[in-house]
């Protein structure tokens, strides 16, 4: 008789659990899973409830010992912060998985599901899943605490200019808005002779000073005051102050240069008009159209002041004009302006129309003036000037009248102005009743100077209709192509109020 031999099969026998006696596959601990978990808790020592600190003002979480970080709910950054709270306890086990369990955002609770493994009796590896509750506790961070205590700034930039108007600061405000340098400021304070910018760090204040040096001719002086000192850690707490002084020369100012400076600028006449102030002072000689630029360092080495205040501008009426065609340029002379036309004009004060007194002068406004036009200028023949340079000049070289700019009807210009500017939120004190007139002067300067407009964001005013670029009088206006659309988040694409946000 033959027997068929089948394939040999091996089967693993079961053993009895040493605790409860149920049959189980053999394992190093000789225990079932239930008994093993009753005997050993691998999550022992890991806290099941932990607190995290959250600042409601800036919506940041505290990462010990003293760092505050921005984290979104159920983000990887927040999960990392939560696991770091358990870092010391998790060092004895192996972390397999971690993830958030959804909780109500307003419940002040965060739940993290952890999966861990650990080697227990006789080399058996046990895996366990459990949940850690994180209680979100409110705590104000140091930065917000300083803000609420009104003693939060660590650096201040004090910008000053020794003039009787604020047109320079209106221009600085617009350039700061264009480059968004106001975002790091904690507070902006406006006083009668300048602006104060407060910052939480010295680096932001230094950045503002560097920007001012690139925008206007200025100089600064830095100082600091010791607030506190920790003798154990040798840490010092300072408050820094940067005092920035802008040159006291503005657009449409009449200045008298020193003979040495005038010679270094191409042998130009000492009496000049400031036509623009950017990072340098732009000067023009109204009798020759010679132009020159003076930077901040050159100005502080050879300073000069304005001979007149803008309120001393007088109104003249043009009686006759004659364009100067033949212009001879002296040896060593500098560049001449191509945007202006030299002319000889006869003018008469509008306040002296009942007399026969007329004045003859040369002007750089030959491309704008016609007989009968009104023009603003300074009367040098009937005034007392207290300036060291002009007092030493030959009286025959001093003109009787210097014309500055053409005069237009201000009321019509304001009514037809279909654009607007944004402003920086700031604290005001010592407001002057003349501020509105000075602001209108600044707006007129923007309309007249295209170079300055390139550094300013100009927005369309939807409340006013769009008209032609020039009016009947020829007053300069800003074209529609130079304006930006003012964005309002609350408006939808059609210009109406947007619909409510869906919450379901």
UniProtKB/Swiss-Prot annotation:
Gene Ontology terms, MF aspect: ribosomal large subunit binding
Keyword Nucleus: yes
Gene Ontology CC entries for this record: cytoplasm; nucleus
Cellular localization per UniProt: Cytoplasm; Nucleus
Main subcellular localisation: cytoplasm
Name of one Pfam family that matches: NMD3
Alphabetical keyword list: Cytoplasm, Nucleus, Protein transport, Transport
BP term (GO), one: protein transport
InterPro entries referenced in this protein's UniProt entry, alphabetically: Nmd3, Nmd3_N, NMD3_OB, NMD_SH3
Function: Acts as an adapter for the XPO1/CRM1-mediated export of the 60S ribosomal subunit.
PANTHER family in the record: 60S RIBOSOMAL EXPORT PROTEIN NMD3, NONSENSE-MEDIATED MRNA DECAY PROTEIN 3
Family: Belongs to the NMD3 family.
Subunit text: Associates with pre-60S ribosomal particles.
Protein's UniProt name: 60S ribosomal export protein NMD3
Species of provenance: Xenopus tropicalis (Western clawed frog)
Gene for this chain: nmd3
């Amino acid at each position: 008789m033959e027997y068929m031999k089948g394939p040999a099969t091996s089967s693993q026998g079961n053993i009895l659990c040493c605790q409860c006696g149920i049959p189980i596959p053999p394992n190093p601990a000789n225990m079932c899973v239930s008994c093993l978990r009753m005997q050993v808790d691998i999550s022992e020592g890991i806290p099941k409830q932990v607190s995290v600190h959250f600042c409601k003002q800036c919506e940041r979480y505290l990462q010990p010992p003293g760092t505050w970080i921005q984290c979104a709910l159920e983000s990887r950054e927040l999960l990392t912060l939560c696991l770091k709270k358990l870092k010391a306890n998790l060092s004895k086990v192996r972390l397999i998985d971690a993830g958030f369990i959804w909780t109500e955002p307003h419940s002040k609770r965060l739940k993290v599901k952890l999966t861990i493994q650990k080697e227990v009796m006789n080399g058996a590896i046990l895996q366990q899943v459990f949940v850690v509750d994180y209680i979100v506790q409110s705590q104000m961070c140091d930065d917000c605490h300083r803000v609420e205590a009104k003693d939060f700034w660590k650096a201040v930039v004090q910008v000053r200019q020794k003039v009787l108007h604020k047109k320079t600061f209106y221009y600085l405000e617009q350039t700061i808005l264009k480059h968004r340098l106001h975002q790091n400021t904690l507070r902006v304070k406006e006083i009668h002779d300048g602006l104060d910018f407060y910052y939480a760090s010295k680096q932001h204040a230094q950045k503002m000073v560097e920007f001012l040096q690139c925008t206007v001719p200025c100089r600064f002086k830095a100082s600091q005051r010791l607030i506190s000192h920790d003798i154990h850690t040798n840490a010092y707490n300072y408050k820094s102050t940067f005092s920035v002084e802008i040159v006291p020369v503005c657009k449409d100012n009449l200045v008298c240069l020193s003979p040495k400076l005038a010679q270094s600028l191409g042998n130009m006449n000492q009496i000049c008009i400031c036509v623009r102030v950017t990072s340098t002072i732009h000067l023009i000689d109204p009798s020759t159209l010679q132009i020159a630029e003076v930077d901040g360092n050159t100005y502080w080495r050879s300073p000069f002041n304005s001979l007149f205040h803008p309120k001393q501008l007088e109104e003249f009426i043009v009686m006759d004009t004659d364009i100067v065609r033949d212009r001879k340029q002296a040896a060593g002379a500098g560049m001449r302006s191509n945007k202006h036309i030299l002319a000889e004009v006869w003018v008469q004060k509008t306040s002296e129309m009942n007399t026969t007194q007329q004045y003859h002068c040369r002007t750089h406004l030959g491309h704008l003036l016609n007989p009968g036009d009104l023009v603003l200028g300074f009367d040098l023949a009937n005034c007392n000037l207290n300036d060291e340079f002009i007092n030493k000049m030959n009286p025959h070289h001093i003109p009787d009248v210097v014309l500055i700019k053409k005069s237009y009807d201000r009321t019509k210009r304001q009514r037809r102005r279909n654009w607007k500017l944004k402003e920086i939120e700031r604290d005001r004190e010592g407001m002057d009743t003349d501020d509105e007139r000075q602001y209108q002067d600044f707006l007129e300067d923007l309309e007249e100077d295209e170079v300055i407009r390139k550094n300013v964001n100009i927005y369309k005013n939807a409340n006013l209709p769009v008209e032609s670029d020039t009016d009947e009088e020829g007053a300069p206006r800003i074209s529609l192509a130079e304006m930006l659309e003012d964005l309002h988040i609350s408006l939808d694409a059609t210009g109406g109020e947007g619909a409510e946000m869906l919450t379901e």
